[in-house]
Amino acid sequence: MKPTDNNSYRHILKYMGIFGGVQGLNILMSIVRNKVVAVLLGTGGMGLISLFNTTVRLVSDSTNLGLSMSAVRELSAAYEQGDEERLKHRIQIIRMWVALTAIAGMLLCILLSPLLNRFTFSWGNHTLHFIALSPTIAFLALAAGETAILKATRQLRQLALQSVYGVLGALLTSIPLFYVWREAAIVPVIVLAAAIQWVLVIIFSLRRYPLKFSFKQTRLSEGYGMVRLGVAFVASGILASAADFIIRSYLSHAGDIQIVGLYNAGFMVTMTYGGMVFHAMETDFFPRLSGVKNLGGEFNKIVNRQIEASTMVISPLLVAMTVGLPILLPLLFSHAFLPVIDMMRGSILAMYLRAMTLPMEYIALSRGDSRHYLLQEAVAALLLVVAVIAGFHFGGLTATGYALTVASFLEFLFVLVYTYYIYGYRLSRHALLRFVFQFSLGLITLAAVLTLEGWLYWVAGALLLVVSIPHKVSLKFFHFK
């Protein structure tokens, strides 16, 4: 296969490396920020940040009309055809709709602030906090719209720089505020971080596509098709945010704010940090898959190659994370978060399954089948909520970690069967073999860290890490070229 083939392994790994590297750099800066915040605010402060952020995401996802995804599809068609005038026209339409959603989201947050306070917290009155957080909704919507423009027009360098600068800006501004005002700085820091992200993305976006605003009914009506497609993204975002909201509210009531902080730390490290290699899918894999007109052999090949590449890249990271948690967790946060290690070890296995499931979930998106995609997300959200509640009820945070893996396995089976019957997708033998091999290593690693101590712990971990790293023999065996 030619190196210029956008669906080749070389291309997939290249962009997974680029955006995974950017995410890694962002995470490195976030480590410093989280470490300082954990020391200054403790588990209670981390839990409070988690509750505010989760609620903000819920309101944001409920009001942005899914434009961050549907706009990419809308603009990509004009960009690929080289029609500059049509592209600029569509950008104006998207910016009008984004501005409307930003205003609506901010006002809705203000109006619903008493209800948000009631359902989020079991103590105190945080209504004014939610009112103060309302500009965050507008900043997030505006930033998402401009980011969609950069993605659709393949401004990869600008996307990477904006991401890095945004995290750096949040780091440099939040630490002094937390140091001086402690928990009182939480709301201002959240608003300021969103504002910094918005300012940075418009700097890059407006350089290439200057702002030309004109609110006309005819132009707004041209965006109805894009909005209809985005409704499914909104619904899926609401489901995901609602699931997070329900989980953290349940933990807040069934446990306490410290439990929420511990769960958030464990979930963040395993699902967010561990999933940094998946970042390229939205930017690179989704547009490529959308460009394939017909289902069949070539379509299946693209999905299977993405699964193989994702499994290959993430597996060594997961082994290293499983082994290194006793060092990694205090480094990321503080020793007060060590009780969540067993939960994290159980949930890391879910990331292997995520590497299989996520590329298949993009199939429905690439076909524009909003109902099928929404059904997949509904099942995933339901499984997540049931798993966390059941796990915490029967075995505390530790059981919650293993319950997350069980939920991910059930989600994988559902998506695999569903995409087969709807789209004729077939998981290749090579992709399945690679997954079985790496998942088995993950199970062996888990058994090793639970049973071994001292130097045997580290020697076994190092050997398993070496085995998980792809090399010439394994690549040849799996026909990975």
Model-derived regions: residue spans:
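Interhelical loop/hinge segments that connect adjacent transmembrane helices in multipass membrane
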Residues: 1-12, 201-244, 284-301, 422-436, ...
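Membrane-proximal transmembrane or re-entrant/amphipathic helices at the cytosolic face
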Residues: 2-6, 446-481
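Transmembrane helical elements of multi-pass membrane transporters/channels
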Residues: 14-34, 46, 166, 190-197, ...
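Hydrophobic alpha-helical transmembrane segments
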Residues: 127, 131, 160-208, 225-228, ...
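Membrane-interface junctions at transmembrane-helix termini in multi-pass inner-membrane proteins
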Residues: 138-162, 348-379, 419-422
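Membrane-water interface segments that mark the loop-to-transmembrane alpha-helix transition
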Residues: 14-26, 52, 61-114, 128, ...
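Alpha-helical transmembrane segments of multi-pass membrane transport and lipid-handling proteins
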Residues: 92-121, 171-172, 179, 277, ...
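Helix-loop junctions and terminal segments of transmembrane helices
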Residues: 65-81, 152, 266, 270-307, ...
